[in-house]
């Protein structure tokens, strides 16, 4: 089970809801993924305009926990304002803190992220900050009281996969809260690797919404994350420099 704050989830896949070809495809992909946590950008949602269509109308919200994010924020203060807006909607008490420090790379601003997380924790939010693969920053965020840390595998939407598995492994080793790999996942192999490293979950969006067949890719990601977690729990064999026969010669009869 994936435990975030007071909540428990069977699925370790967190799915973004943006950039799908249509609301119908989005709905099918969400269902195929088996995800129980759905994230969305508050600034792109018409949560206070019921006359305008949005993905919430397509879903049975009793099956999902919503994770609004503060995408578009450049400062801690902006992130806090967006989070308060999401909370005022009555849909959720979790927030993914996203404070971007560079428009070209969409990498997070570490100083503003830390500041926003602290402010939101003081207001009683369940805080999940998007961060880089900076090992020290991840530790600072968990020490602050964040309910999970979400290090990026590579830049948002780049599909480059896990660029620095060593840093991610360091973050996971020191973690006292769930580690959810976020951003840059391109295909099922990337998701498997994240889980084999020991991550507690994976958040992805473009890898599914941008696929030629989003519904099939959503199912593939579901299976990849399950396989990666099983592999991690099973314990892979150590790598060796030389071969080791699976059928040793000892005890074999001479023909």
Swiss-Prot record:
Pathway listed for it? Cofactor biosynthesis; thiamine diphosphate biosynthesis
Q: Does the UniProt entry include the keyword Cytoplasm?
A: yes
- Return the EC number: 2.8.1.10
| Signal peptide extent | none
Question: What Pfam families would the database entry show?
Answer: ThiG
Q: Where in the cell is it found?
A: Cytoplasm
**One term under GO cellular component:** cytoplasm
Q: Identify the HAMAP family for this entry.
A: ThiG
Give the family, as the similarity comment puts it: Belongs to the ThiG family.
Q: What is this protein called?
A: Thiazole synthase
Organism of derivation: Geobacillus thermodenitrificans (strain NG80-2)
């Amino acid at each position: 089970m994936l435990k975030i704050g007071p909540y428990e989830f069977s699925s370790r896949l967190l799915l973004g809801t943006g950039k799908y070809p249509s609301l119908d495809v989005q709905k099918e992909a969400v269902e195929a993924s088996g995800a129980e946590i759905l994230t969305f950008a508050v600034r792109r949602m018409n949560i206070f305009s019921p006359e305008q269509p949005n993905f919430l109308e397509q879903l049975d919200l009793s099956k999902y926990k919503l994770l609004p994010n503060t995408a578009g924020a450049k400062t801690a203060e902006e992130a806090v304002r967006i989070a308060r807006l999401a909370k005022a909607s009555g849909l959720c008490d979790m927030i993914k803190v996203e404070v971007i420090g560079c428009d070209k790379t969409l990498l997070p601003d570490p100083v503003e992220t830390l500041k926003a997380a602290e402010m939101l924790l003081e207001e009683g939010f369940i805080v999940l900050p998007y961060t880089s693969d900076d090992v020290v920053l991840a530790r600072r965020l968990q020490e602050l009281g964040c309910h999970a840390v979400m290090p990026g595998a590579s830049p948002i939407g780049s599909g480059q996969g896990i660029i620095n598995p060593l840093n991610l492994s360091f973050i996971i080793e020191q973690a006292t809260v769930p580690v959810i790999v976020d951003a840059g996942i391109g295909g099922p192999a990337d998701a498997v690797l994240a889980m084999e490293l020991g991550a507690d979950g994976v958040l992805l969006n473009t890898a599914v919404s941008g696929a030629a067949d989003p519904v099939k890719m959503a199912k593939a990601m579901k299976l990849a994350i399950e396989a990666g977690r099983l592999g991690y729990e099973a314990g892979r064999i150590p790598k060796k420099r030389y071969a080791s026969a699976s059928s040793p010669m000892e005890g074999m009869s001479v023909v």
